[in-house]
Regions:
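Acidic-basic catalytic patches of nuclease active cores, encompassing PD-(D/E)XK
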Residues: 1-33
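Hydrophobic/aromatic beta-strand patches that form the interior of the parallel beta-sheet core
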Residues: 50, 78, 102-104
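Domain-level recognition of nuclease-like catalytic cores that cleave nucleotide substrates
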Residues: 84-117
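Structural motif
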Residues: 30-31, 51-56, 80-84
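A structural micro-motif
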Residues: 24, 75, 99-101
Length: 117
């Protein structure tokens, strides 16, 4: 999944989030390693993050640390992964005793990646 694909997925997800909450402000950032970060603000106040991962980026060494740091600071954290990685990522997060991270799939959100790798 390339940079343009991540950009498209971030755009689709941001649009869906804003349809559900028009007061939400969303900053999109494509990160090195072809993963995306949505920073969510409401009324100028930071409320959470969504990490849009690929099959490859989900294995980056600092991914879990980033999720847990944000969640432990009290922010909503969503991690969006390809359907094939859902069980593995969910098991890993819960095996570490962390329940504040929400794992979602692109497919469940109605966002279809053109490629999943």
């Amino acid at each position: 999944m390339g940079a343009m694909e991540i950009e498209r997925l971030m755009g689709e997800r941001a649009k869906a989030l804003m349809e559900n909450n028009p007061d939400l402000e969303i900053d999109r950032s494509k990160e090195e390693g072809d993963w995306g970060l949505l920073t969510l603000r409401e009324g100028g106040t930071l409320v959470g993050f969504e990490f849009l991962e690929t099959e490859e980026s989900i294995g980056r060494p600092d991914a879990l640390l980033q999720y847990f740091d944000a969640a432990n600071d009290g922010y909503y954290v969503g991690v969006v992964v390809p359907e094939e990685k859902f069980d593995d990522v969910t098991d890993l997060i819960y095996s570490m005793g962390e329940g504040q991270v929400t794992v979602l799939t692109y497919e469940d959100l109605g966002i279809t990646p053109y490629t999943l790798a």
